[in-house]
Amino acid sequence: MKNMKTALSAVLASAMIFGAAMASAETYSASAKGFGGDVTVTVTVEDGKIAAAEAAGISETPALGGAAMPQLCEAIVANQTPYVDTVSGATLTSNAVIEAAAAALAQAGLTFEKAEVVKGEDEVADCDVLVIGMGASGTTAALSAAENGAKVIGVESSTTLGGMGNAAQGMFAIGTTLQQERYGDDLGSDEEYWFNKYMEQSNELGNAALIRTFVGEAKNTVQYLLDHDINVYLSKTAQQVAHFDETIIYHRWNNTQPFVHFQEYLDKNGVDIRWNTTATQLLTDEAGAVVGAVCTREDGSQLTVNAKAVIVSTGSFAGNESMMREALGTAYDNVSIMGGCDGSGLEMMYAVGAAKGELLTMNHGVGPKSRDLEVATELTMNTPCLWVNNQGKRFMNEDLLKDTVEYSSAVLAQGGYAYTIVDQATVDRWADASYENTGSWIHYWDQNGIIGEDGERTIYHAPIDKDAFLRDFETLTATGDGIVANTIEEAAAFIGCSVEDLQNTIDTYNGYVKAGKDDQFFKSAEDLLWTVEEGPFYVTKGYNAVLGALGGVNTNELLQVVDSTNTPISSLYATGNNVSGMSVAAYVNIEGTGLGFALTSGRLAGANAAAASKSFRPLPKVVRFKA
């Protein structure tokens, strides 16, 4: 929590509490909109003081907003005011907690005054390369530009380096030294194979030049990381069952640790990062070249940065409801959005003539919105049991669960949610400790798979604790994400479909399982495991998980942003999730593409922008672009 002690002292000095003291402890609750949905804060007031505070927001990103909520509540109690400092990297969640806490306390008759913000002086700064957004791609862009001789300024709206990259696990690359060490000359695939795979997945609609550049340069990004003391290692096997027969291309790293090393190198190379500073408008000269940006600082003062090249690395638009509705349609109201930015970086580029690229979402798994579950959904939502839509009808080959992107997209096509149904016999089998495992693979094998005799994780889940499973269904029932139905009629009522349709689906599916042959969607015989026959029936509702959003502007292979005629906009570059063309229609299901492209595009854009800045010849007059 940034400057917590100092900032809180200032707040307390100016905060005044009004209202009569309470004679006994009372609880009050209020809600406010956070990052992914509503955040509810419950406060306990005793003798006119804040005795306790709790916050809950099931749609907040666990690693960011989820982690911030208890910190904020602790600060509210410790400092006896809702107006505490926000937590770095979780501004929207922080503001929601503060707003909801203030509203809850107002119910108790307690009101507070915010500390007056003293506006600082406006500033003008000059540099060769300006990087807007210091997430994963912005970090490598800034460092690469500096290492290529540019004077670099980075502006970041939070105080956290790396953004959502802090939650990333690994990246795609082919032809690395790490693969050479493992495979020697028998790698099994090459750049040609992976380029064709990317293009085939996009039905040849992808940006071929950009994809080719990425496939060829990703290995150099891995080496770049290694050269900067970042621990990168080749995964022992593919992350999901669907990719077990492919060359291992997933290169893991240590989550937040890489950005500790990145910060050291940014400091060594003189990169000037302006924290809590948000770019609001790009500047152009009379010829249309982008020559800087106007930014707003936390205290309301203005920072104007004059630059010879600008790289926009502001991340996805998942926090922008209008853009997300454009990408998802009516499914927006059903999906679980895990994280993302507000799309302001894209809007700034559109304002200077950037062509609008395809807007996509990163569909990555399906699960309930309920939290604090122990074991149930590891199986009900992660194995190839029976899945149905809101009409009670089967809609996919459940083998798609071997890849989170594929089955998540299938569920999105059903409106963003779907249901699984298993019977008591299946649960009994899953909980039978006389067996070594549950008998069915789970696609998150590397998280939940049991340890085999060789000490490695397997694709199978260990038998579950039935009591824990039942406790989970109590939670699911309470939150509306599940039910234990004694009859098919009850199951149909929960789903909202006709009993006849659901019963026909179940009867047909049971026939496929018993025959060992799926005549509808051709699920493999070895995965036709669980009939649905005798109640009680365990029904789980799962929502499409959206990790973020992809795209917004088109670029060439140099990461130069282009206009509607595919002509580069002078001195403007974009990286990472701002860029369209790597995925088309749906997030590409090649492991590590997101982080791999973020880091690689940043590294390349930084080098290209630095080179361009050396030949930059500014026009005498600098003006703001007017649409």
Placement of each model-derived feature along the sequence:
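A glycine-rich dinucleotide-binding beta-alpha-beta segment and adjacent secondary-structure elements
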Residues: 281, 289, 487-490, 501-586
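Glycine-rich FAD pyrophosphate-binding loop
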Residues: 147-167
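An anion/pyrophosphate-binding glycine-rich loop and adjacent beta-alpha core
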Residues: 346-348, 355-494
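Active-site- and interface-proximal helix/loop "cap" or "latch" segments in soluble metabolic
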Residues: 26-117
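N-terminal Rossmann-like FAD-binding beta1-loop-alpha1 element of flavoenzymes
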Residues: 126-154
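Conserved N-terminal/central alpha/beta ligand/cofactor-binding core
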Residues: 160-272, 387, 394, 432, ...
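Helical element adjacent to the flavin cofactor pocket in flavoenzyme catalytic cores
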Residues: 251-308, 346, 352
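Glycine-rich loop(s) and the adjacent beta-strand/alpha-helix scaffold that form part
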Residues: 298-301, 305-370, 374, 595-598, ...
